């Protein structure tokens, strides 16, 4: 045993221990993987069949991505117990792209934008001088803030409730509040299993209550096949420059986040966190991050990223063996083959999802604030923060400020993440050079 670990990176635990550890990781990531496609589908008004397929492909692709990260093929992958899943960071750009060109534009931007992260993996040392922790913190905070609006909309009942006039009803808000409260209560439990499963338990209870309140009608459930067969480019692909730019900026930021997650994973796993071995591991992990997202776009799914919560699971279980990752990947791929998983969650009322995601998205914003607070907030940093938040939140709150510009420019800069992110990068470079 080293560094408090029961099983190290290259150890092969007995099958019983491997399966138990893999199931705990799965419990920690399952909801996080299926939430983005559910939010995106609800916002863009996709039908149950499409939503179900997107959920299934998110699970399937997350399994493939996790296997590539853990196995490490040549210079692709980090070779750690590193789990990948559908990223929350891209929800706002995806919704923007979907409004412009539907699923084809989303998948086109997912694939082309991924080359930004692939490029970062090749010039990692130089990229980190430009994308500093301050810049990353600002962008992560903007991502969280933009997502909170999406979460609140779901709490009120979503787009369908806005159309039928029930948005913000007592029932919708009550269900959302119940789910949020249950998650908080279970998360504070001294029982580690209740704590790990707090989100799933909260959603399950909220789903059951909403069913008895007449908010779920399984009578409209469509016919579906027993198995899902992944079909590359099922919905087609198109390329919109404004969507690609928005995606590329977030890809650059997620590359730096992945670097931090891989560093933490290496530290927890008792592996080096400096030197050539670590640098190759980090570059391979970020490269896999980008390549896996490219694969995701081709297989009708959304960008993937390394999941930080699994680092905590390694600490909790004392199991850092990357062979556990193979079983996590297998479970995810297996779940992705069965449409019933996606169908069941497709019928989940918006307030149930909203109650859970509101807390998740708030956590994203608070993580960004934490990154910013970890830096020295001097005069230069204050200026960068002020410029970035003013411009990012400005266009987010009042996008009509860009109404006189050409449509392509409007589409690019109407995203607070894009505008605020570019403002953070440019102002950070200019002010630093100036000084």
Predicted regions mapped to residue ranges:
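N-terminal signal-anchor module of multipass membrane proteins
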Residues: 1-81, 89-99
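Membrane-embedded helical hairpins/re-entrant loop segments and their flanking transmembrane helices
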Residues: 15, 41-77, 249-322
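Short, non-helical or kinked segments that cap or interrupt transmembrane helices
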Residues: 53, 75-88, 129-138, 195-200, ...
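Membrane-embedded alpha-helical modules
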Residues: 97-220, 328-435
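Hydrophobic, membrane-embedded alpha-helices of multi-pass small-molecule transporters
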Residues: 16-28, 168-180, 197-198, 212-213, ...
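Juxtamembrane interface elements at the cytosolic ends of transmembrane helices
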Residues: 2, 33-37, 41, 178-189, ...
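Generic transmembrane alpha-helix signature in multi-pass membrane proteins
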Residues: 37-43, 90-99, 125, 149, ...
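Intrinsically disordered, low-complexity non-transmembrane regions of multi-pass membrane transporters
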Residues: 1-21, 220-231, 267-284, 426-435
């Amino acid at each position: 045993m080293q560094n408090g670990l029961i099983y190290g990176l290259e150890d092969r635990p007995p099958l019983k221990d491997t399966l138990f550890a893999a199931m705990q990781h799965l419990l920690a990531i399952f909801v996080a993987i299926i939430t983005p496609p559910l939010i995106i589908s609800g916002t863009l008004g996709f039908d149950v069949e499409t939503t179900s397929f997107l959920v299934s492909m998110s699970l399937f692709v997350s399994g493939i991505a996790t296997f590539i990260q853990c196995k490490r093929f040549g210079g692709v992958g980090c070779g750690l117990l590193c789990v990948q899943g559908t990223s929350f960071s891209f929800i706002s750009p995806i919704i923007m792209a979907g409004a412009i060109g539907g699923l084809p534009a989303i998948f086109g931007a997912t694939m082309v934008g991924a080359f930004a992260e692939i490029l970062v993996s090749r010039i990692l040392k130089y990229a980190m001088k430009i994308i500093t922790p301050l810049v990353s913190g600002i962008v992560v905070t903007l991502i969280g803030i933009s997502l909170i609006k999406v979460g609140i909309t779901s709490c009120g009942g979503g787009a369908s409730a806005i159309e039928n006039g029930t948005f913000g009803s007592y029932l919708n808000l009550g269900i959302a509040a119940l789910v949020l409260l249950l998650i908080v209560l279970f998360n504070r439990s001294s029982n580690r299993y209740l704590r790990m499963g707090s989100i799933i338990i909260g959603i399950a209870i909220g789903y059951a209550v909403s069913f008895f309140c007449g908010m779920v009608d399984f009578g409209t459930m469509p016919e579906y096949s027993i198995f899902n067969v992944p079909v590359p480019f099922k919905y087609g692909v198109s390329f919109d420059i404004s969507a690609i730019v928005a995606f590329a900026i977030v890809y650059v930021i997620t590359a730096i986040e992945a670097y931090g997650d891989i560093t933490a994973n290496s530290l927890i796993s008792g592996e080096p966190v400096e030197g050539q071995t670590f640098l190759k591991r980090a570059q391979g992990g970020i490269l896999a991050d980008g390549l896996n997202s490219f694969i995701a776009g081709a297989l009708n799914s959304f960008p993937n990223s390394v999941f930080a919560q699994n680092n905590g699971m390694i600490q909790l279980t004392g199991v850092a063996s990357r062979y556990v990752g193979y079983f996590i990947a297998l479970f995810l791929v297996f779940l992705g083959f069965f449409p019933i998983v996606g169908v069941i969650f497709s019928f989940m009322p918006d307030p149930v999802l909203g109650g859970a995601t509101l807390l998740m998205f708030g956590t994203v914003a608070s993580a960004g604030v934490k990154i910013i607070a970890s830096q020295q907030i001097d005069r230069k940093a204050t200026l960068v923060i002020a410029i970035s938040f003013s411009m990012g939140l400005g266009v987010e709150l009042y996008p009509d400020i860009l109404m006189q510009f050409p449509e392509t420019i409007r589409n690019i800069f109407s995203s607070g993440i894009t505008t605020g992110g570019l403002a953070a990068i440019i102002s950070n470079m200019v002010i630093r050079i100036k000084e």
